[in-house]
């Protein structure tokens, strides 16, 4: 199949810099040479490793994963600005709320949201990486019209794209079972739209002791007392992207990989509009 006929696939690998296991998985994908987009959590303790890795792989388009939540049971983080600067955004321990629902129920102040999310973008800008876009961890930063307006304002101020504002056809593998992830991904790839950019949001990680220890406080599908489901899900997504079957699709030109850097270049920032 000629490349110009091929459906466009935008891989967005989220949670970069959340911990070592996620960043090392994203490094494995980057080492294939594939162009993709990766969203970094600049509020997390490991973000500097993500920055160092991404500097080695300029084909990766970098975004800021705007973060207002901290969802793991024993591994928590808080605002870049510190709890005293944005007290309405944190719980009694100074961490972000665990879920979107808990955040929305809390007495968060919009001006503090704007200050903190701006600080996350500033930290990204100061990292030395070229930053192309923003998106939103767990959807919290766009979960009300007022919050969404803040994200749009920040993107305008820093001249950044916003994920899902370029008419993308959005999909995720998050809820697909561990056993069927690869087959389901390949099945979807065979049916990708040629009219729109197919955005596939992925969460990859290496199945390490660090990853095995993570318990998602919000997600019963990925929590079990007997199995490290988070690690199993995320390593299955990693293995899907590294699989010979997917690599063959890319190399044969059956799908054309694009990034947010490409979309910003082709469509510009002024036509951006909130999508599905």
Task: Place the predicted regions along the sequence by residue.
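C-terminal domain-boundary segment and adjacent tail
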Residues: 162-165, 221-276
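Conserved, mostly hydrophobic/aromatic
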Residues: 15, 62, 134, 200, ...
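Active-site gating loops and adjacent loop-to-helix segments of metal-dependent hydrolytic enzymes
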Residues: 77-103, 216-229
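Histidine/acidic-residue-rich catalytic or RNA/ligand-binding cores of hydrolases
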Residues: 22-23, 73-76, 147-148, 173-183, ...
């Amino acid at each position: 199949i000629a490349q110009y006929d091929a459906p466009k696939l935008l891989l967005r690998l989220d949670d970069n810099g959340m911990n070592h296991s996620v960043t090392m998985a994203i490094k494995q994908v980057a080492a294939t040479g594939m162009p993709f987009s990766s969203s970094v959590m600049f509020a997390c303790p490991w973000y500097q490793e993500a920055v160092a890795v991404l500097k080695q792989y300029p084909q990766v388009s970098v975004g800021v994963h705007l973060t207002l939540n901290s969802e793991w049971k024993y591994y928590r983080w808080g605002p870049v600005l510190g709890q005293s600067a944005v007290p309405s955004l944190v719980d009694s321990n100074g961490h972000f709320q665990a879920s979107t629902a808990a955040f929305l129920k809390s007495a968060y102040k919009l001006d503090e949201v704007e200050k903190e999310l701006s600080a996350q973008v500033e930290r990204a800008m100061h990292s030395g990486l070229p930053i192309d876009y923003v998106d939103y961890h767990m959807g919290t930063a766009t979960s009300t019209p007022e919050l969404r307006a803040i994200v749009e304002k920040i993107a305008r101020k820093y001249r950044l794209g916003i994920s899902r504002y370029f008419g993308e056809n959005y999909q995720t593998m998050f809820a697909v079972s561990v056993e069927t992830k690869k087959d389901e991904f390949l099945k979807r790839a065979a049916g990708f739209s040629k009219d729109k950019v197919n955005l596939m949001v992925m969460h990859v990680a290496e199945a390490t002791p660090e990853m095995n220890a993570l318990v998602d406080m919000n997600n019963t599908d990925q929590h079990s007392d007997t199995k490290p489901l988070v690690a199993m899900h995320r390593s299955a997504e990693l293995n899907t992207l590294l699989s010979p079957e997917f690599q063959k699709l890319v190399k044969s030109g059956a799908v054309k990989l694009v990034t947010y850097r490409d979309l910003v270049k082709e469509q510009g920032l002024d036509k951006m509009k909130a999508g599905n």
